[in-house]
């Protein structure tokens, strides 16, 4: 049976089984009841299920929040950024030191929705305008490798979060950035903003007339930066309606912040313009806060973060006001890693992670993650490795389903671990898989993380094995493959076996490769700088 046929059968059987399980649960509770209690049993079945709210943030570094993701590392947070609501959530919930995602937005969103790794789903790169992605792009025709195509939309037979939860009585909404093509309404979401990408969130650009240049300054009358206020109002309305109707709900608020295209309220910006550390930056870089381009202004980025925090707070306040705080899980997490220069505004702070978005070094895939909910110990920290494709089985588990019945997924439920269960060796050493067989400022490469160890394979330079020990070297400064050949070989073989098993696509050697063309490309310097290395790598200026 081929992969596509298997997926169709799995989804059909899964949805059918979910409906039967949901029905059996209701009937089981009311088997000896009167007609009236049978009717009420359905309400009880819904009422005892927790609500789930996922606040999904765009392009946010692991250390891009004021919440330390590692208490032993000053560089794991950004103290200049004020986000009191996020900090309160961290005090009341659980932080995840080792949370991982995909290196880019669209693939990450597919992982969240389907519980599948990117090599399994075939969705390995973001949705741009190129069709098919990169293979026909002249920019890459003389590069060392021919990067493969990627799936362009969700497999119609993949089970999404909304589809998995619906048979368990849930109503689901997805607001904000979708960026997976296809209509969220066809994936189980009753309320959504359509097949959105980055563009709606860049409001200053999205509302331009043809030929009109993008504003370099924030308008004085900006009231809905990154649509974060209007998205939040929709989210609040959805929660109010579901509570009124007695429905458990799944709400995903996929914010356009903190993606570039910096937008914020002017009054919030003024606060950071006048911050002593930002003032020092203006002076050092000979910039005037009254004329600086908004894309270069650290005050704009910091203010965008604080405005976002206000919208997070509005959601948390409404949850409390509705009386559902004790029965609602709230998750805040980023879609991919990043590298924010604003960290360096604080004297003494340097970048703790290697590389950034588009790379499988930790700077591209390690993300901030905080979860609050019933059974989660306030102020706790989880240090096991978790990944974005764990969300679907976790949410399904919270909703009363059996995550073991979910087929063709790679994630596992984290529910028991959040409730205090100590992870065993099997969990701590499980394999996490990452696959980015494309060019950007990066190069085609794949990675596996297993416990403390990480192997990265660069397809254009396969003779340089990469192994790092993240427990001792979070900045991935030392390649220890030569000293540990057996560990490297074991993990490399497991990664390549997995990629083959799930039908992953690979880049190919380019017979038309022209070294001079590749060398002259403006992004090749970074590709070399952050490519494979032996022994100790050279530190970047913002790490020294």
Language-model regions: role of each:
Residues 162, 444-449, 453-457:
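Short, surface-exposed beta-strand/loop micro-motifs that present aromatic residues
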Residues 161, 177, 391, 414:
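Short active-site alpha-helical segment characteristic of glycosyltransferases
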Residues 38-50, 57-80, 88, 101-104, ...:
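Active-site-proximal cap/lid insertion segments
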Residues 91, 100-125:
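Active-site nucleophile/metal-coordination loop of metallo-enzymes that catalyze phosphate/sulfate
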Residues 2, 13-33:
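N-terminal export signals
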């Amino acid at each position: 049976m081929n992969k596509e046929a298997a997926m169709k059968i799995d989804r059909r059987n899964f949805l059918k089984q979910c409906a039967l399980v949901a029905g059996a649960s209701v009937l089981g509770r009311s088997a000896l009841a009167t007609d009236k209690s049978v009717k009420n049993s359905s309400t009880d079945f819904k009422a005892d299920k927790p609500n789930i709210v996922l606040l999904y943030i765009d392009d946010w570094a692991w250390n891009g929040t004021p919440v330390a993701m590692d208490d032993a590392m000053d560089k794991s947070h950004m103290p200049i950024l004020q986000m009191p609501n996020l900090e309160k959530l961290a005090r009341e919930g659980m932080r995840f030191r080792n949370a991982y995602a995909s290196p880019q937005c669209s693939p990450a969103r597919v992982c969240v929705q389907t519980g599948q790794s990117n090599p399994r789903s075939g969705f390995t790169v973001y949705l741009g305008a190129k069709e098919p992605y990169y293979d026909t792009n002249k920019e890459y025709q003389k590069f060392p490798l021919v990067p493969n195509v990627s799936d362009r939309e969700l497999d119609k037979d993949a089970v999404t979060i909304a589809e998995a939860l619906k048979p368990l009585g849930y109503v689901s909404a997805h607001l904000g950035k979708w960026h997976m093509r296809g209509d969220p309404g066809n994936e189980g979401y009753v309320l959504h903003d359509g097949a959105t990408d980055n563009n709606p969130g860049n409001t200053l650009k999205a509302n331009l007339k043809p030929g009109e240049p993008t504003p370099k300054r924030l308008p004085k009358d900006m009231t809905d930066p990154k649509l974060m206020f209007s998205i939040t109002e929709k989210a609040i309305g959805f929660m109010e309606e579901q509570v009124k109707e007695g429905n458990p709900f799944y709400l995903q608020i996929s914010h356009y912040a903190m993606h570039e295209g910096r937008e914020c309220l002017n009054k919030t910006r003024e606060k950071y313009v006048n911050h002593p550390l930002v003032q020092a930056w203006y002076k050092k870089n000979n910039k005037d806060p009254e004329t600086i381009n908004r894309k270069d202004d650290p005050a704009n980025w910091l203010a965008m973060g604080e405005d976002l925090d206000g919208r997070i707070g509005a959601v948390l306040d409404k949850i409390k006001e509705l009386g559902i705080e004790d029965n609602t899980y709230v998750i805040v997490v980023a879609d991919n890693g990043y590298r924010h220069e604003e960290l360096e505004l604080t004297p003494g702070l340097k970048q703790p992670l290697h590389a950034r978005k588009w790379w499988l070094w930790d700077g591209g895939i390690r993300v901030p993650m905080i979860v609050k909910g019933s059974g989660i110990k306030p102020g706790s920290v989880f240090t096991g490795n978790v990944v974005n494709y764990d969300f679907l089985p976790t949410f399904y588990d919270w909703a009363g389903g059996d995550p073991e019945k979910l087929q063709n997924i790679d994630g596992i439920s984290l529910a028991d671990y959040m409730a205090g269960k100590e992870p065993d060796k099997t969990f701590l050493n499980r394999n996490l898989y990452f696959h980015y067989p494309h060019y950007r400022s990066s190069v085609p490469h794949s990675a596996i993380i297993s416990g403390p160890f990480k192997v990265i394979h660069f397809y254009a330079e396969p003779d340089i094995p990469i192994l790092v020990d993240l427990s001792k070297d979070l900045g991935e400064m030392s390649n220890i493959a030569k000293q540990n050949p057996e560990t490297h070989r074991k993990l490399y073989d497991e990664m390549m076996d997995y990629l083959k098993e799930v039908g992953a696509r690979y880049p190919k050697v380019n017979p038309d490769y022209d070294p001079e063309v590749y060398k002259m490309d403006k992004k090749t310097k970074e590709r070399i700088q952050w490519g494979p290395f032996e022994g100790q790598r050279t530190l970047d200026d913002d790490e020294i």
